[in-house]
Amino acid sequence: MKPTILLYDSGMGGLTIYDAIRQTLPNAHYLYCFDNAYFPYSERSENVLIEQAVKIVQKIAEKYPLDMVVVACNTASTVVLPALREKFAFPIVGTVPAIKPAAAISQTKTIGLLATKGTVERPYVAELIEKYAKDCIVEKIGTTTLVELVEEKIRTGNVDQDRLSKVVAEWQTHPTLDTVILGCTHFPLVKQELQQLLPNVKYFIDPGNGIANRVSALLSESVPEEPEQNKENIAFCTKIDEEFFKREVIMQQWGFKRLELLNFL
């Protein structure tokens, strides 16, 4: 049997995690939900994030037997994992800022955490820094603007360079910053633009490969001799808006057969 893996995020940034997992497990069956009715998650309360996580996973699991859920969002992962693991028997993998590898690789021991405001302010992240980067200076930028810029790039192919530059302005002249953690699954999609704006930064760290390895370790993938029926990769959204058909084309380009509305009624 092909393992069925559900990934979800508030937007399409989690596609960076999907892409990393797909390269490791190309024959798995993928479902992807972006919770656009509650985008961006960084502006939602912890209770709302937990409620949405349970509703999304429950609804999709009713129709598709799931082998794994990947919370492809840093902000949600700092909050929802205990609730999901308590309710569901299949493995739940989260996405957290790659503070440990960043602290290990930084030569100047000066790290930048680029994430959403919600992620930057979570006590969980402070605990990770205390545990793995105690000997480092950790500079933080919490931004919702960059999430919006990435969603715009996904839809149009264009990036507003002026707005992007303003987001990281305080780091552009930083004398010792050599490592930046891309602490939101959206941000690897503007890695090249960030490299141009921050030429003194040697390392940009994102969690994609680490998560792919973790998922692979938890799943034993078996490739069937005959193609399985009814195993199409399907994407879901939680609200239909004027961008629906454009998003459907984008999801098809990423290997999903169609985009459906996830109806909770």
Curated annotation (Swiss-Prot):
Gene Ontology MF annotations: glutamate racemase activity
Reaction catalysed by this enzyme: L-glutamate = D-glutamate
Active-site feature positions: 73 (proton donor/acceptor), 184 (proton donor/acceptor)
Pfam families in the record: Asp_Glu_race
EC number: 5.1.1.3
SUPFAM superfamilies named in the record: Aspartate/glutamate racemase (SSF53681)
Residues involved in substrate binding: 9-10, 41-42, 74-75, 185-186
Enzyme class per UniProt: isomerase
GO biological process: cell wall organization; peptidoglycan biosynthetic process; regulation of cell shape
InterPro entries: Asp/Glu/hydantoin_racemase, Asp/Glu_race, Asp/Glu_racemase_AS_1, Asp/Glu_racemase_AS_2, Glu_race
UniProtKB keywords: Cell shape, Cell wall biogenesis/degradation, Isomerase, Peptidoglycan synthesis
Pathway: Cell wall biogenesis; peptidoglycan biosynthesis
Family label: Belongs to the aspartate/glutamate racemases family.
Biological role: Provides the (R)-glutamate required for cell wall biosynthesis.
Protein name: Glutamate racemase
Species this protein is from: Actinobacillus pleuropneumoniae serotype 5b (strain L20)
